[in-house]
């Protein structure tokens, strides 16, 4: 199952000041989870502000294939009538998650707790990504792999557990996907399922499980970790969910406003969950003018309005423990670092190697081809900022939406235009990115 979309190259050119007030699309992590937990609940769940990108829509299709009723009731407005915990039905065909590792891995967890078999598949990029570390704990809980591609990759057929077992599991890396898969499988198990993390990963699953009525406790573990315990076999009840704007998507117009001289942007309803705001903290350390106002929350998730103005940035060192709170933002942070004065060292980025592409190498290549001095030392990325970027390069996106958007942001302030080989995959997370940036003043051709 591969995308047959024709490549759509695009060029970004030095732009006038970016101005305006926008709400970027709904958060992708929350959107996936709202659909999945709505499907595992009894009764009706209404979702406002759902991200209608390809990744999330593939999760919606999977929930329908597993027996839930999922319907669009208006723009970004959806309704889910769930089947209850353990109530998924055997799907008639393979579940195709396209480019989405999050959707695929979370649904694996939910299916593992049901006595059904389901085949998981995706595009060429998703087929290349590791699944073993998701499947390993699910097998401890009673699920089994009937078939998979070499190395335990997709396409993969998972047989859910007839009698799921609660486990205590220590995650090998800080990964919200591993944690969430175990917790979603644990919903069907009697007793308490516990996940221990050495480094705390994003906690959207825990917050939303509470919102839907699960009994879940999270306590500190060690210096940076968490211990999360879920009581199994709850009756989850449908609930309203307002999806905040995605901080990972807000990162692109935010960095663009910082590097394009004279820019002044307002970004509304951006999620400010502390486990997702590593980029905002880092940009402020670099000297960015970012003001927060209108703080509120919904379904346990805080949000705020941000005013971002063009700023003179300086190089900083980003500690490795910040990685889980900004794992998707390092690409666009590297762009900000290239326009800063001085050296920026981003430490401990090993997880970037197993994303939609090897994002560590791809980020270095994106900068290098545009005249930026960059190095990789172990799992660290080092960018030598000189206050400007020569540009003029052609960036290979490797079917990765975040590389495409980061390169386009860079071209808005570089000396020469930046060419991107393909923008088709931007639709996976931010379908409106190009028209929205144009409305703010971006020069794309």
UniProtKB/Swiss-Prot annotation:
InterPro entries: Enolpyruvate_Tfrase_dom, Enolpyruvate_Tfrase_sf, EPSP_synthase, EPSP_synthase_CS, RNA3'P_cycl/enolpyr_Trfase_a/b. It is found in: Cytoplasm. Gene3D superfamilies: Enolpyruvate transferase domain. 3-phosphoshikimate binds at residues 28-29, 33, 175, 177, 328, 355. It comes from the Bacteria. PANTHER family: AROM/DEHYDROQUINATE SYNTHASE, PENTAFUNCTIONAL AROM POLYPEPTIDE. This is 3-phosphoshikimate 1-carboxyvinyltransferase. It comes from Rhodopseudomonas palustris (strain BisA53). The lineage of its organism: Bacteria, Pseudomonadati, Pseudomonadota, Alphaproteobacteria, Hyphomicrobiales. One of its GO terms (cellular component) is cytoplasm. It catalyses: 3-phosphoshikimate + phosphoenolpyruvate = 5-O-(1-carboxyvinyl)-3-phosphoshikimate + phosphate. Its EC number is 2.5.1.19. Belongs to the EPSP synthase family. Catalyzes the transfer of the enolpyruvyl moiety of phosphoenolpyruvate (PEP) to the 5-hydroxyl of shikimate-3-phosphate (S3P) to produce enolpyruvyl shikimate-3-phosphate and inorganic phosphate. Pathway: Metabolic intermediate biosynthesis; chorismate biosynthesis; chorismate from D-erythrose 4-phosphate and phosphoenolpyruvate: step 6/7. PROSITE patterns: EPSP_SYNTHASE_1, EPSP_SYNTHASE_2. CDD domains: EPSP_synthase. The active site is at residue 328. Monomer. Keywords: Amino-acid biosynthesis, Aromatic amino acid biosynthesis, Cytoplasm, Transferase. GO terms for molecular function: 3-phosphoshikimate 1-carboxyvinyltransferase activity. Phosphoenolpyruvate binds at residues 28, 101, 129, 177, 359, 402. GO terms for biological process: amino acid biosynthetic process; aromatic amino acid family biosynthetic process; chorismate biosynthetic process.
